[in-house]
Amino acid sequence: MKDLLWKDFRENRTVLTAIGLLLLIPYGISIVIAVVDLYRGYTTSWAELLLSGSTIALFLSAGVTSFIAGNAIAGERANRSAEFAAYLPIPRQSAVTSKAIVAISSCLFILLVNFGINRLAAWVQSDRSHDVPVQDLAFFGLPAVVLMFGVAWLFSSFSRSPVIAAASGLVAFLVLIGPSTFSMSHATGRISDSWLYWYCSTSLIAGIGGFVVGVVHYLRRVEP
């Protein structure tokens, strides 16, 4: 299993590196703003800049889970390494378990690091006007992450294109969040709560269901 995990990590190394560089951009912009303000003689709270940068990075972290899941299986087919792996005595159960562990652990690491930085900056920052409540992150962010990951994983198990698989997760989120946000913004009381519960439950069911179906399809697939 250790060799499988290392193999799958190498398969996803390019994508993870690109994602890491992408998530550094908001923090880099915050540093540039701090340097410019310091040069101009302005006093800017580093916690405020870090909070802004980490909030953007946290939202980006949710989106990139779709790319990680989309590349988990389809990426191996795209570079033809799946054909080589098919001739090795590797049980498909072990192969899909390794891919799932690498993909899920990568997503959790990215999300937890940015979430931790965001909460640290919010704790230091005295002005909470720009703070994103934890309950909002839980009710909107967690179902979105599960939805995008599960749908992208499902398409990755069928597709040879990691781009198409990754895009499917983002499209699923946009299709679901559009009507949900519109309905919740024009509803009040119990109706608004009903739409929120519908969004959460639908996202979780679709995401978990997509992941399970993707695993089953991979196990039953004859081709690599």
Regions found by a protein language model. Give the residues of each.
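Transmembrane helix boundary and interhelical loop/hinge segments in multi-pass membrane proteins
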Residues: 66-86
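Junction motif at the cytosolic side of a transmembrane helix
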Residues: 4-5, 206-224
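Short helix-to-coil transition segments within interhelical loops
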Residues: 86-92
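Aromatic- and glycine-rich beta-strand/loop motifs that create alpha-glucan
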Residues: 1-23
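Secretory targeting signals
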Residues: 27-70, 97-166
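Central hydrophobic cores of alpha-helical transmembrane segments
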Residues: 21-24, 153, 163-176
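Extracellular/periplasmic helix-loop-helix junctions in multi-pass membrane proteins
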Residues: 181-200
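Interfacial transmembrane-helix starts/ends
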Residues: 5, 9, 13, 92-104
